[in-house]
Amino acid sequence: MAEFIFRHLATEMGLDDEFEISSAAVSYEEEGNGIYPYAADTLLRHSIPFGRHRAHRITRQEYDDADLVIVMDSSNMRLIRRITGDCSKVHKLLEYTVMEQDEVAGYQTVTNPDEVPDVADPWYTGNFEQAYSDIFRGCRALLYALLKSRKSHHC
């Protein structure tokens, strides 16, 4: 869902050409499968467009080519480290919501990734609405952080 939500938010802001967005799994369990039907239903309810999608496990090349790798939870982070031997560009999605709250409060903290909440996993809870809410908040905060970072790097 995160790929489609982020893409939708970027498109709404006229920034769809600014980012290369893709998603990959950390296991082979869903290899080749399309978007999970309950996830598709949730995206439709929120008017988030999505196209064809086939699950695949992240490759070392994809990791190397990425500027940023966003994961949903601590387990994903550990598995990325196991697959790639690195996690220097890996961040939990909800890390950006914590940073946003800290900025509003007037201070910036360095947060231990283990202290950042995980996105509610609908695979175990069946609650796709909660996952959507977490992912939407995280994607919005991530987009804000990327735009802010881009502005600070221009003269």
Model-derived segments and their meaning:
Residues M1-A66, A145-C155:
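Conserved active-site segments centered on acidic
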Residues E30, A39, E62, D67, ...:
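Solvent-exposed, flexible loop/coil residues
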